[in-house]
Swiss-Prot record:
It comes from Thermoplasma acidophilum (strain ATCC 25905 / DSM 1728 / JCM 9062 / NBRC 15155 / AMRC-C165). Belongs to the peptidase S16 family. The keyword Transferase does not apply. This is Putative lon protease homolog. ATP binds at residues 52-59.
């Protein structure tokens, strides 16, 4: 065991004693320069292009940036346009306006009371109280559970009234109302009071509450597509066109006022809109292909229209213009993919942001070994299904990181920062420890995991001698004689 671990083991026997930073950016291992730039970019709202191989912390940096930006202050809604329904309006509400509306809506909910606290006539007419025996039950019960009589007697009683009441109750026919309106004296004037059924309770609405309801009903109907209380981090890796840019759902009734759904109700925001005032993270951005130009347009205009993407859909005729899309773009790619990033998009990032080359190794120092221990503790804590690791086992993980830096990156006396695969090795060792019933991941568990956790190409070479030999031996004789790629039409004659 190295000197570093001898000193450290005297104080901490395993990785459970290692404190995990609360700051998300401090959990990124070995990318100090990138972390500093990311903090500046978050504060100044600059774009980022992270370049490097998989597993070096690109997504962690992007996600951590969302903790350093202010909370969203705007909610985006689409409002019905009575004159031209296919062109809904955009409405932007500030946080203060949204909170005020919520308070107003809460004030229109009225007072919830127990049916026994309501006037007897109200409880009977709403179906809570049996008019014969006075027993209270659910308004969904047509027959009183206490006396087995219809809870509500029909208003017009003929010679066969009782018979009709019994038959109606037997078939679930109820005469109770959903709402009862009464008047009461309030000072020098009469006040209208409305009693409504509310599950097994009664909602009471006074005149002031009813007036607030009327004011709300006069407002144009709207739909919130980007709520105020949203996650400022939006992941759009591998997103389709509709997921990225939004869409308008199809209506089989063509938006018919009576049968269909109005256009504004079918509008769906895309990732560029959901990331408004937040971070839009796109890993492997070159996989978006031509969609990159739409990202560029949104970055330039800070708005992007929502329209139906399917020309065969009823939503194709609907368009919402100038939907806000003011986001911080954090794009990531591998070094080999740099030529495939749209040139104007990259220019836009450089003109209002930074390009960062991620490191793949760091010096093998005591300080960096401590960071490795932090990484091991983080991986175990995030997994939640494996035990912590002894210092002897952790030393093997660090030595494996040193070995990979030498083999992959040709760097001596350095530690690899391609940590995703090391995380897999830690989990494999943890699974072995769990299978054995160990309370901690021991040195032997890591040694066994290292033997198992090797690339499949290495296993193939060991088993078959070479990849070419493996390819040739994969198919049986019958498959070689009749292989799909060598078929011609005569095979079916």
């Amino acid at each position: 065991m190295g000197t570093f671990f001898v000193d450290f083991y005297n104080e901490y026997p395993d990785t459970s004693y290692i404190k995990i930073p609360t700051n998300p950016l401090d959990r990124v291992i070995g990318q100090d320069d990138a972390v500093k730039i990311a903090m500046v970019a978050a504060k100044q709202r600059r774009h980022l292009l992270l370049v490097g191989p998989p597993g070096v912390g690109k997504s962690m940096i992007a996600q951590a940036m969302s903790f350093y930006i202010d909370r969203p202050t705007e909610e985006i809604r689409v409002v019905h346009n009575p004159q031209y329904p296919e062109r809904p309006f955009v409405e932007i509400k500030t946080r203060e306006e949204v909170m005020a509306e919520r308070e107003e809506e809460t004030s229109t909910s009225g007072i919830i009371i127990d049916p026994k606290d309501a006037p007897t006539s109200v409880a009977e007419r709403l179906g809570y109280r049996c008019s014969k025996c006075g027993f209270y039950s659910s308004p969904s019960d047509a027959v009183c559970p206490n006396c087995n009589s219809p809870k509500i007697q029909m208003g017009t009683q003929g010679p066969f009234g009782d018979v009709f009441n019994v038959i109606g109750a037997a078939f679930g026919v109820q005469n109770n109302l959903d709402k009862v309106t009464l008047t009461r004296r309030n000072g020098d004037h009469d006040e209208i009071i409305v009693y409504e059924r509310y599950n097994d309770k009664i909602r009471v609405l006074d005149e002031k509450t009813l007036e607030r309801r009327r004011r709300l009903e006069k407002k144009s109907p709207s739909k919130t597509i980007v709520p105020i209380d949203r996650n400022p981090f939006v992941l759009a890796t591998g997103a389709s066109e509709t997921e990225l840019l939004g869409d308008v759902r199809h209506d089989p009734y063509g938006g018919h006022p009576q049968l269909g759904t109005l256009p504004y109700e079918r509008v769906i925001a895309g990732a560029v809109h959901e990331a408004h005032q937040g971070v839009l993270f796109i890993d492997e951005i070159t996989h978006l292909g031509n969609l990159q130009r739409y990202i560029l347009t949104a970055m330039q205009e800070k708005t992007f229209p929502i329209t139906g993407r399917n020309p065969q859909s009823a939503g194709a005729s609907v368009r919402v213009d100038k939907v806000p899309a003011d986001f911080i773009l954090v794009a990531a790619c591998n070094i080999n993919d740099l030529p495939y990033i749209l040139s104007p998009l990259r220019s836009r990032i450089v003109g209002n942001g930074y390009e960062i080359l991620m490191k793949t190794t760091m010096k093998d120092t005591d300080e960096n070994r401590m960071k490795y221990l932090q990484f091991i503790s983080q991986e175990i804590t995030m997994d939640g299904k494996i035990p912590h690791m002894t210092m002897e086992a952790a030393e093997l993980i660090i030595e494996e990181g040193k070995k990979r830096a030498r083999i992959i990156d040709k760097k001596n006396n350095e530690l690899t920062l391609r940590l995703r695969e090391l995380g897999g090795l830690i989990r494999a060792a943890g699974d072995i420890a769990v299978f054995k019933g160990n309370k901690l991941i021991e040195k032997e568990d890591v040694e066994e995991a290292i033997k198992l956790y090797v690339p499949v190409e290495e296993k193939i070479t060991k088993e078959y001698g070479s990849m070419a030999a493996a390819y040739s031996s994969e198919n049986t004789t019958s498959q070689k004689d009749f292989y799909n790629y060598n078929l011609d039409d005569r095979s079916y004659e």
